[in-house]
Amino acid sequence: MVITEFTPTPPYPERIVGPDTFTGAPRSRDSRPHLTDIIRDMAEAIGRGKGRSGDPITEEELNWYAAGGWLWEHVWDMAHREAVVDGTLWSPGEVELDGIVGTPDRLRVNEDGGLVVVELKTRWASARKFDDLEKWYWQELSQIAGYAKMVGTVHSELHVFYVAGNWQPPIPTARCARIEWTERELEERWGGIVGHARRKGWLK
């Protein structure tokens, strides 16, 4: 038996996510600010960033994380294939409001005919953090609220795949939550997003 390690062409993670979905690829063909970038900058400004101690994360590492998220999204679509086929679940692509663009992961029509924003995340952190979303998931909640405002709904869901579960022992798991917003909550969060973008000079 001869075992030889090899690198495919194109290599991983590019083979998984493709050049258009790499973290370094532009999301939009113009200069409009992207919701995710605004929220990430807001988080850094208020000390809620998701950076790590020590050396900054590399582009290659970011792309591996992106590959993990891409895999979860595609497996999730397969698990909900009936809704995908009948057209009640879809990926909307780019949406825009007040000069800001965003790309919700999925939109779904609920039983009452209402629109639901569906956000999919892959995390290596402990699944216990899901017990307190407002503490540990400020960026994700802000992102979901932004998408909800952009598409005109108060209904949303967050589905998180935890690669190592709660780490005791490290067994994969998934957790999900329905998040119902008030119009006031969405207005306040959106106002903060737009205001931050203007202060940074990203919006006129």
Give the ranges of each region predicted by the language model:
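Metal-dependent nuclease catalytic cores that hydrolyze phosphodiester bonds in DNA/RNA
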Residues: 1-115, 130, 138
